[in-house]
Amino acid sequence: MRDPVETYMNLVPMVVEQTNRGERAYDIFSRLLKERIIFVTGPVEDGMSTLTVAQLLFLEAENPKKEISMYINSPGGVVTSGLAIYDTMQFIRPPVSTLCTGQAASMGSLLLAAGHPDMRFSLPNSRIMVHQPSGGFQGQATDIMLHAQEILNLKKRLNEIYVKHTGQTYKAIEDALERDKFLTADMARDFGIVDKVIDKRSEEPTPKAP
């Protein structure tokens, strides 16, 4: 059976750009990276996280002051992989704007909320979902207890991050994340995950001149 990732990559369109040295071909995502646009798409896992972190660091090296745009369409995934992206967003110097296209669930919603203040956006038909972390463990009883304590520590840390970026109280975040909480774009704005719901290009943030 053919690797679905290989099939997908073969379908990525190429764009041709005219330069002083002739034509140059890029895959569409590399071309958009030149415009400082990053895509966080699909499940959050170590491979995707590493690529996203690398792109953030590259764009910072290119211009430490110019805005980076992050387009998010993700069901979430591995907490530590998501936190690697989150920490890098906070660590680098350029402001990172976030825009939800499709869905931002679980870790996807945390990354959406982690954008620069007043630069977090959602398209009108996007869906956002927040919840507490989940996991399953097996092994010796003591090890299971240690893993259970670790996931509780992660839950507390994630709650604190949501508090920081949404302006909600810790109790409100804890209650909201107790079960899967689905939000429309407008509800996510009212909750503090995004700053604005946009439906026109003219309202979308554009990179500032260096």
UniProtKB/Swiss-Prot annotation:
Q: What is its EC number?
A: 3.4.21.92
UniProt keyword list: Cytoplasm, Hydrolase, Protease, Serine protease
Q: Which residues form the signal peptide?
A: none
What are the catalytic residues?
S106, H131
| Top-level taxon of origin | Bacteria
Q: Which reactions appear under catalytic activity for this entry? A: Hydrolysis of proteins to small peptides in the presence of ATP and magnesium. alpha-casein is the usual test substrate. In the absence of ATP, only oligopeptides shorter than five residues are hydrolyzed (such as succinyl-Leu-Tyr-|-NHMec, and Leu-Tyr-Leu-|-Tyr-Trp, in which cleavage of the -Tyr-|-Leu- and -Tyr-|-Trp bonds also occurs)
Q: Name one GO biological process term.
A: protein quality control for misfolded or incompletely synthesized proteins
InterPro entries given in the database record: ClpP, ClpP/crotonase-like_dom_sf, ClpP/TepA, ClpP_His_AS
GO terms for molecular function, please?
ATP-dependent peptidase activity; ATPase binding; serine-type endopeptidase activity
Name the Pfam families for this protein.
Answer: CLP_protease (PF00574)
GO annotations of cellular component type: cytoplasm; endopeptidase Clp complex
Q: Where in the cell is it found?
A: Cytoplasm
What Gene3D superfamilies does the entry give?
2-enoyl-CoA Hydratase, Chain A, domain 1
The UniProt similarity line reads:
Belongs to the peptidase S14 family.
Report the PANTHER family cross-referenced here.
ATP-DEPENDENT CLP PROTEASE PROTEOLYTIC SUBUNIT (PTHR10381:SF70)
Its biological purpose is as follows: Cleaves peptides in various proteins in a process that requires ATP hydrolysis. Has a chymotrypsin-like activity. Plays a major role in the degradation of misfolded proteins.
Quaternary structure and interacting proteins, as annotated: Fourteen ClpP subunits assemble into 2 heptameric rings which stack back to back to give a disk-like structure with a central cavity, resembling the structure of eukaryotic proteasomes.
**Protein name (Swiss-Prot/TrEMBL):** ATP-dependent Clp protease proteolytic subunit
